[in-house]
């Protein structure tokens, strides 16, 4: 599915029939971290897979956000060095990355486009609420790209937003570090927002995130 500098993700399909369950297969994601060369890691340090599993629990339990269900995680070491780690999660059915779900604005106003525009605004508002709740709890993701927000169809045209890939995130208690992490998350999101959202959409998104009706002058520099 994907490969990074130290990780590789694979999509797996498991047969439930052998366990006496329904015949519908279970789709899983396996993410493997490898620590080699300049990326090698002391065995006494937490493994990235362990950190990611812990952060999913924090995001779910402390922030009230949707995350993939973690089935297992583990690590392997040789001597004083970690060699690899893994995390196994359930696939979010029918989910698409936010950068695929929200295309660039269109000027066509067909009946379907009006519906899609309403759905688009709902998804963007939900994303603002998600990031606001996460930051209010003191958690910063650090790698908050659009591709790490997955949109899954819900009931009555109310999609659900899932947050992924949080191996670098953490709870920050010190106010200065928390503010730095918050701005880093917002900056990461805005890299794609500049290309996919209009200026008015970005202003509405920021108002929703901040919980204000009007932006103060110091807020407007974030949407220049």
Task: Indicate where each model-derived feature is located.
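Hydrophobic residue at the +6 position relative to the catalytic HRD Asp in the kinase catalytic loop
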Residues: 144-154
